[in-house]
Amino acid sequence: MPPDLPSLLLRLVVLLLLSQAEARSFVVDREHDRFLLDGVPFRYVSGSLHYFRVPPVLWADRLLKMQLSGLNAVQFYVPWNYHEPEPGIYNFNGSRDLIAFLNEAAKVNLLVILRPGPYICAEWEMGGLPSWLLRNPNIHLRTSDPAFLEAVDSWFKVLLPKIYPFLYHNGGNIISIQVENEYGSYKACDFKYMRHLAGLFRALLGDKILLFTTDGPHGLRCGSLQGLYTTIDFGPADNVTRIFSLLREYEPHGPLVNSEYYTGWLDYWGQNHSTRSSPAVAQGLEKMLKLGASVNMYMFHGGTNFGYWNGADEKGRFLPITTSYDYDAPISEAGDPTPKLFAIRNVISKFQEIPLGPLPPPSPKMKFGPLTMSLDGNLLSFLDFLCPQGPIHSVLPLTFEAVKLDHGFMLYRTYLTSPVLEPTPFWVPNNGIHDRAYVMVDGVLKGVLERSLKQELYLTGTVGTRLDILLENMGRLSFGSNHSDFKGLLEAPLLGQTILTEWMMFPLKVDKLVKWWFPLQLMKRALPQASSVPAFYSAKFPVFGLLGDTFLYLPGWTKGQVWINGFNLGRYWTMRGPQQTLYVPRLLLFGRSINKITLLELENVPHNPQVQFLDKPILNSTLHWGYNFLLSETQGSFEPMELSGH
């Protein structure tokens, strides 16, 4: 063999690989109003799935079911705040392992439509923007404000190089990337900002990747930008022909694309469970596919807002989003195929081949209980453990952002400096409670005040009376004209016309306390019922037989947070609804050892403090919207008080 032959063969192999990679392309064919994938006419039928709402061990299951439904792509967001919890500190491990999710999609031959933001909406906490941005109170989010752009640039210089190898023309599965998200619905209409983002994406990802925008029919003017492919979003109730004609005003040539075809809708606490009928969703999909459109179904599997990650809207009043993000999607929150999935699959089969073989059956479910919950202690009893560094002192109350607290709860404390002998109104001006205040006098809960509601709470006290306000962040605004949603007491409270000053702020590390549960066992104490909320309750339980998914049911409990074996399952609000059960994936349970459930009940404990685990969810039982609980001094129990919104 000639001495140069091995090196010659190596060069040939490299050239062959390069030519194959060069052949990979995903482009817009404007002349024929279509996409071309590797030079061949192509359209995607995609579905949305958010890796951050699904435990990692279930990613493969959900993606396989999507592929077996006839989809050839998956669309998902990247929430900035999920990956950069503090400036310059990044997390891409575990449930945040974006690369692992891309690989799981590739295993089932799903192409990827990526939506990295920086703003994503997604009904996610602050629309995916990190709340630490608000530590600069003068920052203008989603604009060309240099302070915002500096943070965005730093983030994308970390994120985008990670995904570069996964671009389709580089041999990966990412065929297109969205710039921003529904920017036309935002008040700023800052084209300088959009041009900056487009330039940043091009600088970090090159010229070959297809960049696009998505907006609603009325947001196209401010959301579209030359050089970015314009797409639209709408649902089954909209007129397909009319909406696509609006899109043609901004994108005269090229494929029609609905980037968010709504298979269902989100739920707010206190409103009816949202649904979309299967026939309507299927009919709308068929109309679009007959027009040759590419479609992404939002959502195909919704998942769960575990922990504190739910977002919120403001539509005349503050509307936090439920823990369940089931979305009435084709694949349920528990990962099960629904009749809607089969209706969609039938439509897709008319236009392209469906993978052979049946879909996997629903996962095993189990039910057990009831379990009796035991009182571990009043929240105030554990203040030294919840805030080991001690309080922050200020004449006027500080916000969550000012003390660098992103989620959860903060306790505000002050003492009366003069007697208040007659019942006197306690209030916070300018809707300054963000979002829910549990007001205690000398450790006894006197009432609850809530953002956007007109409320009255009358207090009395003597010199030295302790006033505690437990402030709950119920999720930052994820959509609308203002994402600068500061949390905590935004104004100084008043007692009558007297401004209360000299505050102590205790940022609470509730999740750490639950995980380090030994302090509660050391300090467990019996407290009278009247002073037992906010309080921790817990129970230990075994699980016998085959583990299955289940749904935690909390009859009679009011509002709070729940943990299973230290994992923050999310918020419950049974008194307001519509969600009555919380999805518990079987992976959170131990089959051969003792499990533990922990509740932080904020308002009212049932006379029979029990919980149950059901084999079916209850998502559609709205009970009350405007209500409060005030302590009746005559009866020694909590009674509802009707309230009206602004």
Curated annotation (Swiss-Prot):
It is found in: Secreted. Its EC number is 3.2.1.-. The active site is at E182 (proton donor), E260 (nucleophile). Coiled coil: none annotated. Its main location: secreted. Keywords: Glycoprotein, Glycosidase, Hydrolase, Secreted, Signal. Glycans are attached at N93, N239. The keyword Protein transport does not apply. The keyword Amino-acid biosynthesis does not apply. Residues 1-23 form the signal peptide. One of its GO terms (molecular function) is beta-galactosidase activity. GO terms for cellular component: extracellular space. Belongs to the glycosyl hydrolase 35 family. PANTHER family: BETA-GALACTOSIDASE RELATED. Probable glycosyl hydrolase. This is Beta-galactosidase-1-like protein.
